Regions:
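Active-site-proximal helix-loop-helix substrate-binding element of RNase H-like nuclease domains
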Residues: 32, 37, 41-183
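Acidic catalytic cores of enzymes that act on phosphate-bearing nucleotides/polynucleotides
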Residues: 185-188
């Protein structure tokens, strides 16, 4: 059995906190910006869809391969968003590390779970995420200064974009490391 840990970064004009993940991903302007993954114990790989990269065909095949378990922190979000974007994947093949953690009495939240089980600093979630999500994944107000644009794209701040890519990859590493700690305690 293969294992594929996944994290995506997305954007949509729909406020996910107010409307929920389904409405967010159903928006006409919904987009997956990047897709990071770790196959088994191989290094994390990043696919920057926003810059024209494509998910490797082998990985696309694994998304609906019953012999590959997909893992994510809040797996329902990744599953639904990937399906909305045309990558068909069966929910029964997914395992939610957040659910697994809370089932065991650990706190929810990738960072809090990692801290609670004491994972090494180089495996933890990066703290830069919220401001990067606000910059790239939430519409910006059009102003004279920003040329009237409603979205920030990678070329608007390459340094921030690079950090956002690192953040996405590190989320996969954090989820994978947490799962390695939790897998001895099966969820029925």
């Amino acid at each position: 059995m293969q294992h594929l840990s996944i994290d995506i970064e997305t954007r949509s004009s729909v406020n996910i906190a107010k409307s929920g993940a389904y409405k967010y991903a159903q928006s006409e302007d919904f987009e997956i910006l990047m897709f990071s993954y770790k196959l088994n114990d191989l290094p994390v790989q990043l696919v920057v869809l926003k810059q024209g990269e494509k998910i490797p065909p082998y990985i696309v095949g694994l998304l609906n391969d019953e012999n590959c378990i997909k893992h994510a922190y809040n797996a329902a979000f990744e599953w639904y968003c990937l399906n909305q974007a045309g990558y068909k994947t069966n929910i029964s093949q997914w395992r939610c590390t957040m659910f697994h953690a809370t089932y065991l009495g650990l706190p929810a939240g990738l960072s809090m779970t990692g801290n609670a089980i004491g994972i090494a600093d180089d495996k933890k979630k990066l703290t830069t995420g919220n401001r990067l999500i606000q910059f790239f994944s939430v519409p910006c107000k059009p102003t004279k200064t920003n040329g009237g644009r409603t979205w920030n794209d990678p070329y608007h701040d390459l340094d921030k974009w690079k950090l956002y890519c690192e953040y996405n990859m590190q989320d996969v590493e954090a989820e994978y490391t947490i799962y390695q700690h939790l897998k001895a305690f099966e969820v029925p």
